[in-house]
């Protein structure tokens, strides 16, 4: 999607809005972490003889505390081979080569950004991998962005009619349809176009939604409406993905399934290192490298 021309200027209460957004992202993080630990506790199928996983939280500072920071929450368990739920609130100045790529940064390089980012790589190949991210960015303008997308790792499950994909898309569609500022068909198409491996001519997964540069006119609710939609994306994800995990996590799998999973994870690595804007943004703005690259799966295979 082509980047729009966003209005310049910040509202008088921008500090309040920044604080509200930051608090929401951190609250959502805590909710998801608690729900994922409950899933670890409830496993009854393969590997249930192993200890249930628990998140390990690690706080980090950007620029020795002069540019904000965040919290990495990582877990390696018997359901989730690797899952990271991260929040960050950072500020500073964009480097010269990056300013023209960000709305409002060419006029003034200063920025503020807060958000939550999640990636889950389950043990069981029947459970799809997932990614979710929502954020608020402030330059001389301000906007929201984010989305959620599902990546089944078995070819027989990578079809639009698979029950997991149908359920996931329906949850995102309902979240969008509650809000005038959201456009489900547009955001779904945007996701399909964004999460695409051009060099392999194939999608990363079975899609979801993706949006960016969301700054709506006051006539349809402005910042408050955009924030309400962004919250609903997070809430919808926090309900639908645990449901998908619980539907599949006790199912048996074969060594062939595991091999197929590891090859599909290789595609995930290729996308994140070659195309992902969030990865590039984080590395170019002095983000926490360990946190940024934690989205990569723990084990992969290239045939």
Swiss-Prot record:
Which residues does the annotation say bind substrate?
Answer: 117, 133-135, 286-288
Q: Which GO terms describe its cellular component?
A: cytoplasm
- Can you tell which superkingdom this protein's organism belongs to? Bacteria
Q: Which InterPro entries match?
A: Coprogen_oxidase_aer (IPR001260), Coprogen_oxidase_aer_sf (IPR036406), Coprogen_oxidase_CS (IPR018375)
The record's Gene Ontology biological-process terms are: protoporphyrinogen IX biosynthetic process
Q: Where is this region: Important for dimerization?
A: 268-303
Q: What is this protein called?
A: Oxygen-dependent coproporphyrinogen-III oxidase
């Amino acid at each position: 999607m082509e980047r729009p021309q966003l209005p310049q200027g910040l509202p008088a209460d921008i500090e309040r809005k920044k604080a509200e957004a930051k608090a929401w992202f951190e609250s959502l993080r805590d909710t998801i972490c608690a729900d994922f630990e409950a899933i670890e506790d409830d496993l009854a199928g393969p590997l249930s003889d192993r200890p249930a996983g628990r998140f390990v939280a690690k706080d980090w500072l950007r620029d020795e505390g002069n540019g904000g920071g965040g919290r990495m929450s990582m877990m390696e368990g018997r359901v989730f081979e690797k899952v990271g739920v991260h929040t960050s609130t950072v500020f500073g100045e964009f480097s010269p080569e990056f300013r023209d790529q960000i709305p409002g940064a060419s006029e003034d390089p200063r920025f503020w950004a807060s958000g939550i980012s999640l990636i889950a790589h389950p043990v069981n190949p029947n459970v799809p991998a997932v990614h979710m991210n929502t954020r608020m960015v402030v330059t001389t303008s301000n906007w929201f962005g984010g989305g959620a997308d599902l990546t089944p790792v078995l070819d027989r499950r990578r079809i639009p009619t698979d029950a997991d994909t149908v359920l996931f898309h329906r949850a995102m569609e309902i979240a969008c349809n509650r809000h005038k500022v959201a456009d489900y068909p547009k955001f779904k198409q945007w996701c399909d176009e964004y999460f695409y491996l051009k060099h392999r001519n194939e999608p990363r997964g079975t899609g979801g939604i993706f949006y960016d540069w969301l700054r709506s006119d006051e006539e349809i609710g402005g910042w408050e409406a955009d924030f309400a939609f962004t919250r609903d994306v997070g809430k919808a994800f926090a309900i639908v993905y645990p449901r998908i995990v619980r539907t599949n996590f006790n199912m048996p799998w074969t060594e062939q399934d595991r091999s197929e999973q590891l090859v599909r994870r290789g595609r995930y690595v290729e996308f994140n290192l070659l195309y992902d804007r969030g990865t590039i943004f984080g590395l170019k703005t002095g983000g926490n490298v360990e946190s940024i690259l934690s989205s990569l799966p723990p084990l992969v295979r290239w045939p």
